[in-house]
Regions:
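Structured catalytic cores of enzymes that bind and process phosphorylated ligands/cofactors
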Residues: 33-34, 41, 62-65, 69, ...
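Short, well-ordered secondary-structure micro-motifs
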Residues: 19, 62, 83-84, 120-124, ...
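Conserved nucleotide-sensing/catalytic segment adjacent to the nucleotide-binding pocket
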Residues: 67-106
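Conserved G1/Walker A P-loop phosphate-binding module
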Residues: 1-82
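Conserved C-terminal guanine-recognition region of P-loop GTPase G domains, centered on the G4
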Residues: 93-166
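Short, glycine/charged-enriched secondary-structure capping and boundary segments
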Residues: 22-23, 41-44, 85-88, 124-128, ...
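Canonical P-loop GTPase G-domain recognition
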Residues: 2-16, 145-190
C-alpha cells in the first residue's frame, strides 16, 4: 500500500507558507473540475481533499503529508475557473514559484486531463513547465468510463503523441487505472 498515513498539512497562499521539503513531492495538476481532488481521495483512501462541482474550488497549493515522508501537492485547477484575472495571475505566479523553488524535490508531476477533450493550451503550458524544470511527467486521463474501448485507445495514443509522456487511463467511477497510478507513484518515490 502506497499511502499508509496521510494528513492535510497546509494550504499555501504564499511561498513563505510552503513547508520545509522532506523526501520528495508529487504534484497534481489539471484544469478545474478534472478530478484532482477525487483522485487524491482515492489514493488516500479517505475524503481528505475537498471535492466540489464548482470549478476553481482549490485556490491554494494544498500540501498533504504522506507517510511522514512525502508531500502530495494539489495545485489550483486552471482553465475556466470563475475567478478574477488578478486571482488567476496570483495562482500562476504561485505555481511558477512552487516549480522554481521545489524543482529538486518534485519526484513526479501528475497532469490530469479530461479524456473527452483534446489537449488544451493550459495543459500544454503545464507540460512546458515540466520540461523546462526537467520534471518527470505522468498524464492521467480522467473520466474514461464515458468512452468506448475503441475511443479510449485512440485518446491514449493522441495524448501520448501530443505530450510524449506516459499515459494512464483512469476512472474514479470504475477505479480503472488506480493500481497503475499507485505503481507509478511508488516507483517515482523510491
Amino acid at each position: 500500500m502506497l499511502v499508509r498515513s496521510v494528513r492535510f498539512f497546509v494550504a499555501a497562499r504564499t511561498v513563505e507558507q510552503f513547508p520545509q521539503p522532506l523526501e520528495g513531492d508529487v504534484c497534481f495538476a489539471g484544469r478545474s473540475n478534472v478530478g484532482k481532488s477525487t483522485l487524491l481521495n482515492i489514493l488516500f483512501n479517505q475524503k481528505l481533499a475537498k471535492v466540489s462541482k464548482t470549478p476553481g474550488k482549490t485556490r491554494t497549493i494544498n500540501f498533504y503529508l504522506v507517510n511522514e515522508r512525502y508531500y502530495f501537492v494539489d495545485l489550483p485547477g486552471y482553465g475556466y475557473a470563475a475567478v478574477s484575472k488578478t486571482e488567476r495571475r496570483q495562482w500562476k505566479k504561485l505555481i511558477e514559484d512552487y516549480f522554481s523553488l521545489r524543482k529538486n524535490e518534485i519526484k513526479l508531476s501528475v497532469l490530469l486531463v479530461d479524456s473527452r477533450l483534446t489537449a488544451q493550451e493550459s495543459d500544454r503550458i503545464f507540460v512546458e513547465y515540466c520540461e523546462y524544470y526537467g520534471l518527470k511527467l505522468l498524464i492521467v486521463l480522467s473520466k474514461t468510463d464515458k468512452l468506448s474501448e475503441a475511443q479510449l485507445k485512440k485518446v491514449v495514443q493522441y495524448f501520448s503523441d501530443e505530450f510524449g509522456s506516459e499515459v494512464i487511463p483512469y476512472s474514479a467511477l470504475t477505479r480503472r487505472g488506480v493500481r497503475e497510478i499507485v505503481e507509478r507513484l511508488a516507483k517515482a518515490l523510491e
